[in-house]
Amino acid sequence: MDKWGLTLLSMVVGLGLLYFVSGDMIPSASAQSGQEEAGVVEINQAQFAELVYDYTQEGEWQFKGDKPVIVDFYAVWCGPCKRLHPRLEQLAREQKGEVIIYSIDAEKAAELSRRIGIRAFPTLLFIPVEGTPTLSEGLLSLKDLRQQADKIKGGH
């Protein structure tokens, strides 16, 4: 390979790595129905707009999913967020796809976080298929998470 080709290849690989590290190339959370065995699924703000709610459009809340959703807005430096994650993984295993659980690095998704009203970490967004979503700030116990999951599924 000549010097020009090697330089071009290096630039392409470097840009690809930069794109990946920036968080824009998170593995796709394609369809909610395919998330049943996945546990907590990391998404970015573009995926949130596609799968959950298009926050870029003005107007009333319009949920895009067909199953209840919990969205964990976290910060990588947040101790309570780190303690919450295993509880959410446990809840995802217990729910077996009845409730989809997404996780978003709120600092990388600053515009979304601002529009949703994230002011503290962790913040959970509980979204029923029909009705109004609710926000909960702070660390929740597994028992509280189960109760919230039951609520958004239409239970007690």
Task: Show where each model-derived region lies.
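N-terminal targeting signals for export/organelle localization
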Residues: 1-46, 156
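Short pre-active-site segment immediately N-terminal to redox-active cysteine/selenocysteine motifs
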Residues: 66-69, 73-77, 120
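Hydrophobic beta-strand anchors of alpha/beta hydrolase catalytic cores
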Residues: 70-71, 101, 124
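Typically the conserved alpha-helix immediately C-terminal to a functionally engaged Cys/Sec
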Residues: 80-95
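Conserved acidic residues
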Residues: 105-107
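Non-catalytic, surface beta->alpha helical segment in thiol-disulfide oxidoreductase systems
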Residues: 120, 125-156
